[in-house]
Amino acid sequence: MTDMPTLDAIRQAPKALLHDHLDGGLRPETVLDIAGQVGYDGLPSTDAGELASWFRTQSHSGSLERYLEPFSHTVAVMQTPEALYRVAYECVEDLAADAVVYAEIRFAPELHINQGLTFDEIVDAVLAGFAAGERACAGAGCPIKVRLLVTAMRHAAMSREIAELAIRFRDKGVVGFDIAGAEAGYPPSRHLDAFEYMRDNNARFTIHAGEAFGLPSIHEAIAFCGADRLGHGVRIVDDIEVGPDGDVKLGRLAAILRDKRIPLELCPSSNVQTGAVASIAEHPFDLLARSRFRVTVNTDNRLMSDTSMSQEMYRLVETFGYGWSDIQRFTINAMKSAFIAFDERLEIIDEVIKPRFAVLIG
């Protein structure tokens, strides 16, 4: 096989996904179906194709705040145990169909309480959907392991409660904690209590930082909060200088991020939609990869960005000329950075990822 991977070939490659929002990855048909069942009449279209196009167009807004607006529709149809179970189940199916072998999916339980569900009931429904999806995919010959991150909204005041939820479910499929939402005006340090609670319980967490806001957000996430990973982190490029001769000079923050091997959950297509970068070609992914940061490739929101892991990888291949060895490195980076036990990570790398890439690389 040639060293320039095609999209069809990439679809066969094993993938590891760390940054994907459950409420940003619904099938358009499912949104319509559940909306009809629960009587939600706020959708902009009753045609699946038109609805998918609307989500994509609305999300290509140029700002994170506007990018988040269409989520009101997906969240509206995820307010019952049955709906949460179905969305979780179909998420597993869709990822497995794209050859994802490991995924950490995140969502904010506090957005799903409109019909009186408790946080525990909400998480139970999602985990049950994941488990059933895993069983079905294993039976179909495309095994996948999916784990959950529970997210607190950074503008709200529930982060400690959500962190406690993460610990209650830590042995049932929840592997970590996150904060998300608009960055400007809502720094990570507002949620120190939640992060300290996670550290006190020897638990892992990631923080959305450096997506719409700059270096101060990243600095707080690392220095004050102790983040294990950074959600996006794309603005770390503001602390990197590239000279006329191509020499790369890292600032203090960029250097410690690289040297401590803090993973970056980069989401190229989403970053273009939110205006974090102007285009894939101008995305700092390649600069960060060449500078040996621990970069990972992610979808963020598959419905909103009309994307998949294969498409994200292929866009990088098209833009930066990556080959199979690069894709394998990004995949192993993600698997090394997962919030499951070391032996589980190693097993997936050695017994699934490397053997399947060996066939592709030839």
Curated annotation (Swiss-Prot):
Does this UniProt record's set of keywords contain Hydrolase? yes
User: Which EC number(s) are documented for this chain?
Assistant: 3.5.4.4
List of residues binding Zn(2+): H19, H21, H208, D300
| Record GO terms (molecular function) | 2'-deoxyadenosine deaminase activity; adenosine deaminase activity; zinc ion binding
Q: Does the keyword Transport apply?
A: no
| List of residues binding substrate | H21, D23, G181
Residues with site note (Important for catalytic activity): H232
UniProt keyword list:
Hydrolase, Metal-binding, Nucleotide metabolism, Zinc
Cofactor binding: number and manner: Binds 1 zinc ion per subunit.
What is the main EC category here? hydrolase
State the protein's purpose: Catalyzes the hydrolytic deamination of adenosine and 2-deoxyadenosine.
Which PANTHER family does this entry report, sorted A to Z?
A: ADENOSINE DEAMINASE (PTHR11409:SF43)
Q: What is this protein called?
A: Adenosine deaminase
